[in-house]
Amino acid sequence: MAVEVVDVSGALAVKPGFLLDQAIRVVSEFVGLADFILDLGDSAAIVRAKAALDKLDVAEGLAELEGSAARVAVDEKRMINCRADLNQLVPFKYDWAWQKYLDGCANHWMPQEVNMTADIALWKNPEGLTDDERRIVMRNLGFFSTADSLVANNLVLAVYRLITNPECRQYILRQAFEEAIHTHAYQYCIESLAMDEGEIFNMYHEIPSVAKKAAWGLKYTRSISDPKFETGTVETDKELLRNLVAYYCVLEGIFFYCGFTQILSMGRRNKMTGVAEQFQYILRDESMHLNFGIDVINQIKIENPHLWDAEMKEEATQMILQGTQLEIEYARDTMPRGVLGMNAAMMEDYLKFIANRRLSQIGLKEEYPGTTNPFPWMSEIMDLKKEKNFFETRVIEYQTGGALSWD
């Protein structure tokens, strides 16, 4: 509060409270008299902050949100190019997307919960693994440590922004987190086994069979990861569709299966059981990612049938066939000789069997007639409920990353 000012000679006097009255009059013009009186204890910075909020235009601020301002009806929701408010999660249109999000949360696990003691001892033992077995472990950790990062980048930088459905976006966020967990798992394995981290993480630059798969995937994310890229035309919508086929049907649906089969086969033989346990969890996560992506692709086809023309079908077919060939080359590189009860020829048959499934899942003709599955146990493990342990077929605490036994 201002005080009375009086000069000692008595020639000048200011009435008590005069300065306070003047201050109130000036400030009240900006923030309101009542508010000012209540906030006399506020600092100048707080007064400025409150004044700025008084000037906030709510309508202008909310106009920046994606979609309209009206309440959302189910029929207004679409997979791409939706104009409804994307911040209104409910009502759900795609219940399957929300269920996958819930299932993913229930299946949460963390790499450090897996005991790597036996793996470390086996890896350090010069007689513990053959050279071919060591090659398989290193090649797969090298490929997967990069591949899951590529998938995560594609989700975060492109797919999340371009899929215009909130329940699907909710699952995409969960998937991106799971990709981070998978990269964490590979790092945990590499660190636990005291591998040369530079060699493993740079393998996609140095090993041709790994580099070609990475380069193939990256070309499909280059354009849509541009912040200026927008869907809304036939060509840009098709570009997004190509990306979804590349990353869900090929990267996660084909490129991962040679490595999964090799590492899980080691686990079945009681070798590298900690690494194999983590790969089993990752396979279960990736199976759900794959199924989600296929559902998204098929829903886009239903809502936009003009996109799925003869040209697009041929492109999608070629993408899956190219991916299959790249994975066959990778199998030959990682298995120059028979190992773990399998060889490159058997893996080629398996990959063609998988490719037929991917083609049929998005409504395309199978291109490898007469192929069969030489590894039926892989189908069994993929088809299990998430809470089941393939090797013991008993209920486990997968929700808390409970350890699996490979006996």
Q: Where are the regions a protein language model picked out?
A:
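N-terminal intrinsically disordered, low-complexity tails
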Residues: 6-54
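Short, flexible helical or helix-coil boundary motifs
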Residues: 27, 34, 44-47, 53-56, ...
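Membrane-interacting alpha-helical segments
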Residues: 50-69, 133-135, 304
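Amphipathic alpha-helical packing elements
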Residues: 59-123
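Long, low-hydrophobicity ectodomains and other hydrophilic envelope-associated domains
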Residues: 127-129
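Non-heme di-metal
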Residues: 131-407
